[in-house]
Each structure stands twice: as C-alpha cells, then as structure tokens.
C-alpha cells in the first residue's frame, strides 16, 4: 500500500478543519453533545484527541482565537473527565466557570491597563 502525499490544498483544508474543530472544544455544551453521543468512548476518536495536542505548540497555538480550547483538549486526555461530560450539569459548571474567568480577567486587565497608562503619564510629565 503506497503512502499518498497530501497536496498543498489538502494540507490547507486539513489545517482549517482541525483549527475549527479544536476551537469548538472550548464550548462545554459541544463537549456534552459529543459525550452524550458516545464519541469519547470511541478509541479512534480518543486517539484523535491525542493527535490534536500538537495545537499546543506555539507555531500552531498562535492561530487560536479561543485559547481555553487547549485546556479542554488537555482535560479530554483523561478518561474521568470524558465520562463526566455526559452529565449536562458538568458542562453547565464548566460554562459558568469560564464566564467567571472571563469577567475576572477583563476587570483585571482593565485595571492593569489603567495603571500602566497612569505610570506612562507620570513618566511623561516628570521627564519634561
């Protein structure tokens, strides 16, 4: 059986499909959907989750819009986590925790940016 080489176009399409799929893993409701339909019990699918870990490498991670998908991908390596995702309450809890994280992160980032702007303003006025 001869190995077939992917064309540049096929590689580009595979990259886009895998990028989109990995980012879908940031959605706890999608993870619940996959778990309820038995995907996480399917050995080839679990192996595919292992294969997708290459997205953690900086040369690939830079394309992600939803970096929390990498954390979910990491958690999906654990059978216990995959089993818990069947429970809608588990997905709801993860969703709530993500919202809390984003809210806290946003407030913290705004405060940090304000402090930085104030510091720069002080440096500009004292440097004159």
Swiss-Prot record:
The record, for Pfam families, names: Med31 (PF05669)
Q: Which gene encodes it?
A: med31-a
GO CC annotation terms, alphabetical:
core mediator complex; mediator complex
The UniProt entry, under PANTHER family, shows:
MEDIATOR OF RNA POLYMERASE II TRANSCRIPTION SUBUNIT 31
> Its family?
Belongs to the Mediator complex subunit 31 family.
Transferase among keywords: no
Single GO biological process annotation from the record: regulation of transcription by RNA polymerase II
Organism listed in the record: Xenopus laevis (African clawed frog)
Q: What does this protein do?
A: Component of the Mediator complex, a coactivator involved in the regulated transcription of nearly all RNA polymerase II-dependent genes. Mediator functions as a bridge to convey information from gene-specific regulatory proteins to the basal RNA polymerase II transcription machinery. Mediator is recruited to promoters by direct interactions with regulatory proteins and serves as a scaffold for the assembly of a functional preinitiation complex with RNA polymerase II and the general transcription factors.
User: What keywords appear on the UniProt entry?
Assistant: Activator, Nucleus, Transcription, Transcription regulation
Which proteins does it associate with, and in what oligomeric form? Component of the Mediator complex.
Q: What is its main location?
A: nucleus
Recorded protein name is Mediator of RNA polymerase II transcription subunit 31-A
Subcellular location, record wording: Nucleus
């Amino acid at each position: 059986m001869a190995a077939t080489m992917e064309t540049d176009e096929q590689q580009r399409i595979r990259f886009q499909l895998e990028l989109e799929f990995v980012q879908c893993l940031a959605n706890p409701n999608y993870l619940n959907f996959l778990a309820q339909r038995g995907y996480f019990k399917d050995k080839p699918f679990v192996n595919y989750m292992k294969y997708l870990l290459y997205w953690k490498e900086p040369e690939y991670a830079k394309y992600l819009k939803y970096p929390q998908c990498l954390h979910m991908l990491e958690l999906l390596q654990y059978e216990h986590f995959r089993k818990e995702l069947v429970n809608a309450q588990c997905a709801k809890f993860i969703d709530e925790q993500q919202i809390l994280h984003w809210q806290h992160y946003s407030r913290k980032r705004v405060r940090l940016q304000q402090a930085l702007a104030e510091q720069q303003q002080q440096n500009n006025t004292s440097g004159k």
